[in-house]
Amino acid sequence: MDFSLSPEHEMTRKVARDFAQKEIAPVVKEYDRRQEPIPFALARMGELGILGISIPVRYGGAGMDFISLGLVCEELEAVDTSLRVAMSVHTGLCSLTLLQWGTEEQKREFLVPLAKGTRIGCGAFTEPGAGSDVAAMAASAKRSGDCYVLNGEKMWISLASKADLALVAVKTNPASPKPSEGLSAFIVDLRSDGVKTGDIKGKLGVRAGATGWISFTDVKVPAANRIGEEGEGFKVTMSAFDHGRYTVASGATGLIRACLEASVSYAKTRKTFGKPIAERQLIQEKIAKMSQDYQIARLLYLQAGWLKNLGKRCTRETSYAKKFATEASFSAAAEAVQIHGAYGFSDEYDVERYLRNSKGAVIYEGSSEVQTLIQAGYALGTRVDKPLRCEPPAYDEKEWQA
């Protein structure tokens, strides 16, 4: 078992770190205050090859492995969660799901521009009345000749107003005795007639990122845009969540690290009663816990990335990583604020933003409660991963970089 990173991994991490630290860190506080997305972020991520980091070169990507994807997400969220969220929805939910389930024609038409960053994608699954219960979604699509006609609304969609394409799951067979088998997935051009999008303001966190809604009114979608067979929408969606949760877990690991680094720096300079608070044992306890959690979270996401490289289903492992890392990041951010005292209550220091940003990840892409049920199902033997018609792609360096 080799825990070392390759020179390519180190190079990838440096590209992501330099971008986040040098280009985003100096401006993110202002955009967070204004509750506006950083206007150049997505374009730069495309130019640097970050958006297509783990997509084969033949489909416009950088051809790097899934460990590289995790390292990128860790570095991005160490600066701001909005950057990692873009990776989760564009790369995780949309691009990697297309790589797994799309036909060759669909990959050429949609995946190539997504990987290059010339088009932006998102995943549209959550609805006003359907979040964790995916099978309860009400948005629908009816076949009409060589098209489907979509109607309905999606809510809490990251990049909704910025994306060009959306991977959308809707009901195509409302009469199905098993609701999950009545869903189908489509790639929808968000510039189509009948599509409207908008932003949601007043969020607790991720204020430097775009979160919004999408409505579909008699939107015609070519049947050729269906991802998978009719009735496979639930399986496609669950595959998307596996990809997305991996990016959430690795990103949350970066947030833990950011909280740790900020706390160590502050504790060494802040004095109480004539001594740096770093010498106070209760402060040391908090910092030690952050350090432990960072190492555990990192090992969990690297394990999931290793399995993804092998092309193995890792729903259980991504669930472990997602639940632990997101809960640990929320705890680390709260403790970082506590260590900073009154300054932590002000946006003068980044830890205030870390705390606000960290809360969302224990809710989206499968809440902590959903992850608990998933893990209990595996432990009790009541949950078994059945074979998929389109299994996750294994990483092959020679093939992916050709």
Predicted features and spans:
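A short, Trp-centered hydrophobic/proline-enriched beta-strand micro-motif
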Residues: 117-125, 167-169
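Short, surface-exposed charged micro-motifs
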Residues: 138-140, 156
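Alpha-helical interface subdomain recognition
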Residues: 1-89, 101-106, 113-118, 131-134, ...
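A short core secondary-structure module
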Residues: 146-147, 151-197
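Flexible, small-/acidic-enriched active-site or ligand-binding loops
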Residues: 136, 191-222
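Short Gly/Pro-enriched turn/cap motifs at secondary-structure boundaries
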Residues: 114, 129-132, 156-159, 176-177, ...
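Short Ser/Thr-interspersed hydrophobic loop/turn segments at strand-loop and sheet-helix junctions
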Residues: 49, 73-77, 169-171, 188-193, ...
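Flexible, glycine-rich active-site loops centered on histidine and acidic residues
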Residues: 95-101, 123-124, 135, 175
